[in-house]
């Protein structure tokens, strides 16, 4: 079957932004103008096409990136059809994982900014992620009709906060309730959209006289940026003072794809102005799959190889999202990087080294779906029927092994105990949590060996709230959650040479007799528990030695200070005595347990607390505040670096986990939400005396 659209007319783009910049509304308008949706969905009415999970419609925020396919022939209907795949990405900080994941499979992005709020904190995070994956991007300043809208203020903020190089290719005509349209700086014409046709119709006109000088100034700025694409153009520009429309577009395209500039436009998606021109810019300036370097990967011997975006190449694809669909069950969204895939094919999951059979292939139009028979290089679609594939896995031709680069997922930073409200739901809850963990790699589930409770861990409080909420909605499991907890440990600091334990019961009949002498010493951190049998001359008979070790091991689970597990100790059994009749395993087990407890009390016991490696990315103005706050949380600041590409500082510190609860909220308020942080477990370290005292007091029987 021949390819419907040549690959150079493909655009795989993301629309990403801060939480209220109007991103979902912008996506909705894109779908309306490209003819997918005939009735516009509004986020605030809870009916937007891409927000298809119930919670998203209720909360008015986008949680999962739906991949939508549409076709565009240009605002003036003068282009051949272009195939656009749009990944709608969430803007909330607890869902950054979704944004990372979609950035990985995009070729370009549209950054949507609010004309009033400008460059907000989450926009900075998303910008850094786009830098990380070197994604070319456009900027669309939305909500130009709102009170306080200011296009040029956003331009300045992009330069100052993002260290970006924005190049306006339009300027607004008016603002707030006087926002009528835009000046197209390439054609030097005004564009006014017709309200009655919901913006489907528009006309070019002359630039209003009062805007002419301003438009000239910004056109010059744009032509200069275009001229910098090559020496040849620069010479022509210096000689003639201008460039042709085709030259400007081609040069801006080259520089956008090289991540040197960000073409900037404006409009109001809600009032149907500007989105059509943004779609034209996606085609004019963002790359097709063949405009960017071929995808790198590793072969079986871990040597680097590449896969070209061509139908004739061997098949390779990356799974970037798992979702559960109410009708077909589990969907796996994949981006095909090379070759072709037909339904019914058998492919290799090269990460898990398992074969997978492709059931149906469906292309999503938000939550409607169209079945397709094959997908080719550049396509994004969802596959039904995969058994072992999870997010980040590579699928490839089973005769041409490749692992495309893995996505790196952050470790969860917050954990809570969760239990079903009724015993009957226990099994259902386990199933639900495992299904949710398969969809979301930043969410983990485990069973706590000490308490037997189910512990869920994730990227933040909102993240876990939504997980609990989804259990209730999608799986009908109501659960109660506990307070976030810290896992402390205990150990000793001194060696005790001779610790005696004697268990004797002799009151008529069969007695009990066990007697051991132990040496207890601290081990270096992370060594764990070690038991040494140094008995000479049979003072403790062979058959009782395992019972002695068992007695010590059982006592390890609950330390003498506050009942936390004991780690990093070495116990040597070197002497003891026994009774021919009364000695048995139980007596020796009890004697060992008593000796060990006694020894721990005498060997300077301490409590160890988990230390976290914390990284805060913050604008420079707040670096002092952030460092001060980390120090007040008993943190050790270990260094400060520049953020790659400018735009702030990365502060690295080691902070006790117990001091990090509520940190997201306090960091948000201390930096007006402009800083982000990540943390992961580093090691256990001795808690200071005042902290130990507080823990011991809180654990003491009341």
Curated annotation (Swiss-Prot):
It comes from the Bacteria. Its main location: cytoplasm. GO terms for molecular function: GTP binding; GTPase activity; guanosine tetraphosphate binding; translation elongation factor activity. GTP binds at residues 17-24, 88-92, 142-145. GO terms for cellular component: cytoplasm. It holds the Pfam family GTP_EFTU_D2. Residues 8-290 form the tr-type G domain. Transmembrane segments: none annotated. The keyword Transmembrane does not apply. The keyword Transmembrane helix does not apply. Coiled coil: none annotated. Keywords: Cytoplasm, Elongation factor, GTP-binding, Nucleotide-binding, Protein biosynthesis. One of its GO terms (biological process) is ribosome disassembly. It is found in: Cytoplasm. Belongs to the TRAFAC class translation factor GTPase superfamily. Classic translation factor GTPase family. EF-G/EF-2 subfamily. Catalyzes the GTP-dependent ribosomal translocation step during translation elongation. During this step, the ribosome changes from the pre-translocational (PRE) to the post-translocational (POST) state as the newly formed A-site-bound peptidyl-tRNA and P-site-bound deacylated tRNA move to the P and E sites, respectively. Catalyzes the coordinated movement of the two tRNA molecules, the mRNA and conformational changes in the ribosome. This is Elongation factor G. It comes from Herminiimonas arsenicoxydans. The gene is fusA.
């Amino acid at each position: 079957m021949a390819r419907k659209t040549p690959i150079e007319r493909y655009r795989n783009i993301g629309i990403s932004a801060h939480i209220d910049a109007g991103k979902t509304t912008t996506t909705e308008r894109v779908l309306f103008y490209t003819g997918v949706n005939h009735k516009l969905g509004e986020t605030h009415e809870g009916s937007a096409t891409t927000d298809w999970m119930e919670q998203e419609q209720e909360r008015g925020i986008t949680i999962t990136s739906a991949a939508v396919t549409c076709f565009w022939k240009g605002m003036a209907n003068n282009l051949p059809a272009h195939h656009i795949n749009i990944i709608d990405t969430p803007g909330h900080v607890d869902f950054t994982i979704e944004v990372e994941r979609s950035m990985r499979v995009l070729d370009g992005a549209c950054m949507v900014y609010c004309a009033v709020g400008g460059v907000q904190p989450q926009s900075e995070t998303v910008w850094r992620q786009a830098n990380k994956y070197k994604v070319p991007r456009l900027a669309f300043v939305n909500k130009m009709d709102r009170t306080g809208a200011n296009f040029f203020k956003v331009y300045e903020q992009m330069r100052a906060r993002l260290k970006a190089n924005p190049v306006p290719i339009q300027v607004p005509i008016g603002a707030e309730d006087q926002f009528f349209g835009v000046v197209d700086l390439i054609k030097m014409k005004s564009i006014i959209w017709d309200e009655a046709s919901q913006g489907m119709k528009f006309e070019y006109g002359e630039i209003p006289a009062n805007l002419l000088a301003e438009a000239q100034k910004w056109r010059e700025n744009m032509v200069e940026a275009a001229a910098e694409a090559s020496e040849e153009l620069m010479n022509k520009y210096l000689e003639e003072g201008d460039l042709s429309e085709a030259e400007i577009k081609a040069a801006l395209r080259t520089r956008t794809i090289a991540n040197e500039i960000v073409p900037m436009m404006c409009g109001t998606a809600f009032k149907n102005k500007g989105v059509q021109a943004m779609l034209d810019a996606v085609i004019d300036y963002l790359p097709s799959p063949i405009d960017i370097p071929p995808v790198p990967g590793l072969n079986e011997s871990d040597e680097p190889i590449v896969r070209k975006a061509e139908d004739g190449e061997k098949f390779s694809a990356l799974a970037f999202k798992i979702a559960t669909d109410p009708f077909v069950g589990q969907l796996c969204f994949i981006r095909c990087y090379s070759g072709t895939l037909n339904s019914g094919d058998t492919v290799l999951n090269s990460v898990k080294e398992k074969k997978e059979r492709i059931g149906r292939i469906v292309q999503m139009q938000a939550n409607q779906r169209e079945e397709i028979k094959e997908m080719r290089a550049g396509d994004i679609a969802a596959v039904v029927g995969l058994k072992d594939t999870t997010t980040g896995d590579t699928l490839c031709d089973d005769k041409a092994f490749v692992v495309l680069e893995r996505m790196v997922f952050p470790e969860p930073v917050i954990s809570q105990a969760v239990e079903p409200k009724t015993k009957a739901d226990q099994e259902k809850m386990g199933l639900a949590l495992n299904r949710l963990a398969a969809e979301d790699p930043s969410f983990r589930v485990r069973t706590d060996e000490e308490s037997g409770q189910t512990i869920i861990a994730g990227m933040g409080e909102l993240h876990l709230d939504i997980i609990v909420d989804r259990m209730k909605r999608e799986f009908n499991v109501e659960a109660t959650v506990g307070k976030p907890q810290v896992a402390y440990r205990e150990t000793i600091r001194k060696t005790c040479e001779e610790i005696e334990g004697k268990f004797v019961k002799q009151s008529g009949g069969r007695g009990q007799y066990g007697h051991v002498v132990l040496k207890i010493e601290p081990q270096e951190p992370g060594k764990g528990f070690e038991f040494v049998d140094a008995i000479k001359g049979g003072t403790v008979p062979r058959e009782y030695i395992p019972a002695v070790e068992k007695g010590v091991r059982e006592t390890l689970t609950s330390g003498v200070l506050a009942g936390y597990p004991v780690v990093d100790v070495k116990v040597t059994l070197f002497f003891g005595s026994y009774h021919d009749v009364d000695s048995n395993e139980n007596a020796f087990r009890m004697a060992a347990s008593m000796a060990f407890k006694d020894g721990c009390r005498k060997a300077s016991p301490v409590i160890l607390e988990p230390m976290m490696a914390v990284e805060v990315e913050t604008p420079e103005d707040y670096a002092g505040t952030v460092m001060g706050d980390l120090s007040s949380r008993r943190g050790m600041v270990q260094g400060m670096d520049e953020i790659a590409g400018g735009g702030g500082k990365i502060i690295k510190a080691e902070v006790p986990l117990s001091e990090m609860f509520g940190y997201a909220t306090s960091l948000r308020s201390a930096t007006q939400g402009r800083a982000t942080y990540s943390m992961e477990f580093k090691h256990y370290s001795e808690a200071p005396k005042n902290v130990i005292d507080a823990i011991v007091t809180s654990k003491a029987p009341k």
